[in-house]
């Protein structure tokens, strides 16, 4: 077939998820689109941000009040030593009650903020999933030819989840962290500008140190990830081909390769972990030197009555907490990059070109005859490479048209055009005298029944799967359809008969049995036009005979398109379309084609020579 599937590279392990640290191509544009999605929930969103700000503003007052308690205790102790009184426990009790109320209020606003932001992000995720689900029904089949299923699934699941989770955490965290920095700085300056200057000196030193360590460790982290990928790839390869490895005595080679990859992983891992592990103790060392300087300066200022003794404790608390929001902002920025990258992939999907809309006043036939006409049809999966050129054919109601050709010749192309899975480049296809574009897609596909080798059955009972062809069918109608398809006897051999539940991949029944069930489903739907895919040698002879009998019964009185694998079974077909490398090379019936002594004759003779 000419439509070579071009898989976009999946964005994560096995096509599911994004790579960590992936950045959006258009950060500003993507975030603008994202904010438009938040607009319906802007009240909750803004109230959530306001709650975050209020919570932080209340919280930053806490250390100052703690310092007042210490000052009160110290002052009371000094008064007692000097014989001027003692500690005022009533004042301390009131201050503690105030402190408790402040922290409780801050927690309440923080909880409310989390509840509101979680609601906004999940509502937005719900809205995106709903739009994506509606979008997927509008996409042409060509979209799925050009994009891997793993990549599409990743956009539906991982990207939306990443977007929801990171948006919930990053925006509110970033806002509250900015407010924390400003709040801590204001409170520190209110205590002493000299101590604030002393505390801020150590921050550039810590940042320089972190940058040096990160630069040194980065190459080892890259090597670690590369080695980890080699180890994982080797293990997956060896386990999936374990039988072949043992059959060819490849265990020693496999172990030798694994040891080589594992040694590389060990070397790069311990170096990267050692260097990254140095950051915390070194930054703590610089931070502690800064705290010592703050304490000495604070003691000096206390002696000179510039600050109270409790202010030293308050200032140290602010200093220790000051670097936390800085690191949170850094993490939030990285998270926002992930949010934008995930959102960009989601918006790319939502912006994909859709199928041409159905006509506003479609044709609805009460009695479908099954007359099909191809008129000067031109088509190519790639517009620059036409595979069907100026093809015309008239098929009477009830006639059988076989489509033959070697494997990969593109035999399903014609039936895909008939089902309007793809739009024609030129020409027209008519059913009962009406252009297929005059029908709705659902109306068109209701006229056509498909029985393909790759039989699609969903997780559920056999009865539910058969009724999929006609949801309103009674149990008796389902059973009659199963009998007509020669599958009723097989169903009764199962423990639960028609109520037997098929698993997700229908692996609890054979391929031939799956195809018999799809024949029964087609019988129940009772279409006037059929598309059939013959059984191949992958099923046993008895099942193949049953499938052929079922198909013969199904084709009676119906216009049928048969994708043929054995040319002996379609000698009596009214029309035969011969395809090779995606092109139609011959058209006629069996006798006409054999007289031409062309490609069909070679195919036919080759099959019988093999037999």
Pin down the residues of each PLM region:
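Short intracellular "coupling" helices and adjacent cytoplasmic loop segments at the cytosolic face
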Residues: 16-22, 122, 130-154, 158-160, ...
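Juxtamembrane loop-to-helix connectors within ABC transporter transmembrane domains
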Residues: 30, 38, 70, 117, ...
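An intracellular "coupling" helix at the cytosolic face of ABC transporter transmembrane type-1 domains
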Residues: 40, 141-142, 160-167, 171, ...
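Transmembrane helices of ABC transporter permease
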Residues: 44-57, 68, 169-223, 294-307, ...
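Transmembrane helix-loop-helix hairpins at lipid-water interfaces of multipass membrane proteins
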Residues: 45-109, 190-194, 305-309
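Hydrophobic alpha-helical segments in the permease module
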Residues: 99-106, 110, 203-211, 276-290, ...
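Cytosolic ends of transmembrane helices, especially the final helix of ABC transmembrane type-1 domains
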Residues: 118, 227, 250, 274, ...
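ABC-type nucleotide-binding domain
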Residues: 351, 357-359, 365-611
